[in-house]
Structure formats: C-alpha cells, structure tokens
Amino acid sequence: RLPVETLSAFNQLFRKELGSNNVSTFEEGEFTRPSARFATESGRSFEGKLDDLKTADSILVLGTDLVRHHEVVGFFAKRLLPSGTKLLVIDQKENDLAPLSNKTLRATKSSDEDVLSALSAAIVKLGLAKGKTAVKAGDLDGLASKTGLESEEYLDAAYVIAASEKPVILFEKGITPSAVADFATLIGARIISIKGGANNLAASQLKLDQPLNLKTSKAVVVFAGDDEVSQKMTNEVEKVPFKVVQAAYASPLTAAADVVLPSTTWLEQDGHYLNLDGHLQEAHRAITPAEECMSASEALAAIATGFGIALEDNWEKELHQQVASVELN
C-alpha cells in the first residue's frame, strides 16, 4: 500500500546509496516478475486493458480465483455473464467462479501450459484458430491424456473460448507469460494479468521484484506501513540480528524489532498508485495522522538526511526505465 514516491525513495536510499543488493517487496515479484521479464525480452507491452474486459464476448480465467482474491476484476467479469458472455475456467484448484462458468477444466495432473497445448489442439481441430500454432489437430488425444482429461472436454472448452470475436484471458502467477501470449495469438485474444497487491506494477517497474535472501544479513529495515506481513516473512526477518520496522500497527514483527518507527496508514498519506491497467492515480489523505507518526516517505527522508544523502524526486522517470507488461498512461 505504499505509494510510488515511497517505493522510489526506499529503492534510492537502500540500493543505490547504501549499496544493498537485497531490496524488494513482501511479495518479491511473485505476481509480476515473469511478465516483466517477458516484456523486456520481447521489447513490448503485451497486455491489454480492463476496458477490453468490458467488451469481451468470452473470458478465460486461468489459474486465479477472482471471487476470493481479486474481487474488483471478478466483479467486472461476472457482470458480463447475464448478457451472454461465455466463461471458461482453467484451474488446478477449486475455483469459486466454476459454478458460473460455461465450462471448467480442472487438470490436477499437469501444468497450465500442458492444458493450453491440449486446448490449442482442440481449437485447431474445430477450425477455430485465428493465428498460427505448432500444435496439430492430431495431437489432441495425446495432449489431453497427458493432463488426465478426455479430448471431448477440450473440444467443449475450445468452443466456449474460441468461437467468439473478442476473447479476453485473465491469468495470474504460475504460468509462463509466453505460453499465454502464444495462446492469445491463436484465438485473437487480449491478455490481462492479475498483479497482486496495490502498486505491485510500480514496484516491478522500479525493479523491486526480486526474491529476498536474508540468511546472511546482519540488519534488515522493513517499511510495512499498514500492510499485513505473512508469517513466513516474519519468521525470516526475526532471524536477522538487528531489525528496524516501520509499521502502523503492533504485530509479531514489531514485537521482534530492535527499533520500531510509528507509521501512518494509507488513509493518512498522499501519493500515487499504478494500477494493473497501467493507469497512474493520485491518492489524497483522508485522515490527519497523529503528530508522532511519520509517513514512510517522511521517515525515509529523515534517515537519508542522517546519512547526509539527498533523495531525488524522479519517480515518474523511473517508472518508464523499462518496458512494462502493460502500456503505462
């Protein structure tokens, strides 16, 4: 929930000025790193916008539960169904959208990439392909068998997603973006990836998306704000000899800290947020914080001053330092 300004200042201070190569976010790029890498390698933004979802006549939800974890996007998808938009759900787990779908593929014996390959063969067999693929119609039985599902299941699913003019694919972590992009080309679909928490896309653009390794760290600085810190992350931080934590609420993490800095909540701070659509939005504080509580940006500026460091306000330029998975605006 930290604004872009804070993420930029955090990156400047600890990576660029103090030389740490172990700077990231709580999610460690889990939702964004593969897509960011694919965009960099291909040299282009490959995702569409939420506006594409509004006009979709078929939707593929791939490996994500929009009801449980991404309610806003889930609402956009669900409200289209009464008007005739078709829904295909592919997930190895139980998915709360499945009861609303026209077809659900739950292949627990294989990867989502394998399922897309079998589905591609079914699309080719039905003559619904709009783009090229190396998969052939004759591959269907073998590919379907590999996933533990019958060929007929894939033929049904192929008709749901490919017999339409404006298909949209919604996907999350756990599948290779290049595989999704290839499948999208086959059926002429737009792609939207679900990017996790607020400002995850901004963190990715600032390269704050790498896995953390705290095993040899002697000190750690955590700016939690009012975010909830996982038990796994708390356990990792607790092992570090010296811990500084800025947080809005008491938690096991603050209890283990050597230094605790009181923090404002997201309602008590100004700043910018980059949504999954690539749209930059400005938030204004709704509540005046207590005098003793600094925002994360103010705390970082104070720490930087103590080191004799002047932080630059160039976060907008930094957001465009690499190709994003979705066009920024």
Q: Model regions: which residues?
A:
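Cofactor-pocket helix-loop regions in the catalytic cores of large enzyme subunits
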Residues: R1-N329
